[in-house]
Amino acid sequence: MAVALALAAALAAPALAAQPTTGGIVFVGSSIFHRWTRLESQMAPLPITNVAFDGSVTADMLRMVDSRVIPLRPKVIAYYCGSNDVALGEPAAAITGRIVRFIERVSTALPDTRVVFVSINRAPSKEDRWDVVDDVNRQIKMYAASHPHVEYVDVNPVLFDANGKPRLDLYMGDELHLRPPAYEGFANILKPVLTRAFGD
């Protein structure tokens, strides 16, 4: 199943433009970013390139970093990936390790590039694996605290009500993918962070 998912993700990956924008903000990751249909307008006037694709896992991010991310020479990378790893039963340590390897590869090639890690969603469909989601998020938050070029951003508060219950109105019927109001909440949290990182 993992092989089939990786193959499907590779086939779904969009091709980079012949002359892509460089020096901007690149969004990498899985469907949460890929399906953010109003990303560019909600982040305007920030220069956004979105190379996320459905079904991707953290191993895909490692495979594409040299060919599809580093050539764009982004000033900032927004990273959301790991949710599909969780669904496949991967342990937190393995997921975290691949995320850190991605960051380290970027830092080696582009030492001035900032990486903004967006927390993995505690989606209702994965409630039985929230402990893994929380562990990955916690480990990356700790990593970011000791690496000045990395920032951790928690978007999960958008997805829960005042009683700590998931806001099902923000999810599609699969209780995994998000409706437009969820992305509005994400933009309110993420845009100030990216604006600051891009301006530094």
Q: Could you describe each region identified by the protein language model?
A:
Residues 19-101, 124-134, 138:
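Conserved SGNH/GDSL esterase-like catalytic core that processes O-acyl groups on lipids
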Residues 96-118, 135-150:
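Charged, glycine-enriched surface loops/patches
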Residues 46, 75-76, 113, 147-150, ...:
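Secondary-structure boundary/capping positions in well-ordered alpha/beta enzyme cores
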Residues 124-200:
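Catalytic His-Asp segment of secreted/periplasmic serine-dependent ester chemistry enzymes
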Residues 80, 118-119:
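Alpha/beta-hydrolase-fold catalytic nucleophile elbow
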Residues 1-28, 32-44, 71-72, 108, ...:
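N-terminal secretory targeting modules
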Residues 51, 118, 153-156:
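Conserved beta-strand termini and adjacent loop/short-helix elements that scaffold enzyme active sites
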